[in-house]
Regions:
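Active-site-adjacent loops and short helices of periplasmic peptidoglycan-processing enzymes
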Residues: 30-183
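N-terminal Lys/Arg-rich, disordered targeting/topogenic segments
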Residues: 1-15
């Protein structure tokens, strides 16, 4: 049974319409904004931001006080780089920092008492193996003491609008007053 030219033309038109409708539907699905949820996330605190605008896409208890632990080292590294952009500057690890860190079972990068290394080495040691001795050495290099460096950390946090953050040390070792929020 042959189809008439009129019927074939109608089928082609119908096929084209269906094709373009499918293309349009696919584009709408791809471009339509979706609501992001954090329902399946195991963490009690989270925030998801757009990198280009800072817009909050989703959050979960983002303003609750938490202990920042090793996230502290990001502020330590930032201040060390700002204070000393020459990453090849030599720094000697002071003997007095090690006993307290070892007593607290702090994570160490493996540098030795009295060893002279560069600021770059200390930054790597602080950020990669989470070396507390590196953070202490950087703090003393930048501000002279852990306390003065913590004050500088709090000043920088205020400049950055981190209203829920208070630093007590450059390492992130536990202190009940060493706090932050995931929003900060």
């Amino acid at each position: 049974m042959k189809t008439s030219p009129r019927r074939r033309k109608h089928r082609r038109r119908t096929f084209r319409r269906l094709f373009w409708l499918l293309v349009l539907a696919t584009l709408l699905l791809l471009l339509w904004p979706r609501r992001v949820t954090l329902d399946g996330l195991n963490s009690p605190h989270a925030i998801l931001l757009r990198a280009d605008s800072g817009e909050v896409l989703a959050e979960k208890d983002a303003d609750s006080t938490i202990y920042p632990a090793s996230m502290t080292k990001m502020m330590t590294a930032l201040l060390a780089i700002e204070a000393n952009p020459d990453l090849d500057t030599p720094v000697t690890l002071p003997e007095e920092i090690f006993p307290a860190l070892q007593a607290q079972n702090a994570s160490l990068a493996g540098f030795q008492t009295g060893e002279t290394v560069t600021v770059r080495d200390l930054l790597y040691g602080a950020m990669l193996p989470s070396g507390a001795e590196c953070c202490e050495a950087l703090a003393r290099e930048v501000s002279g003491s852990e306390e003065a460096f913590a004050a500088r950390m709090n000043q920088k946090a205020a400049e950055l609008g981190m209203t829920g953050t208070h630093f007590c040390n450059p390492t992130g070792l536990h202190d009940p007053e060493h706090v932050s929020t995931v929003r900060d």
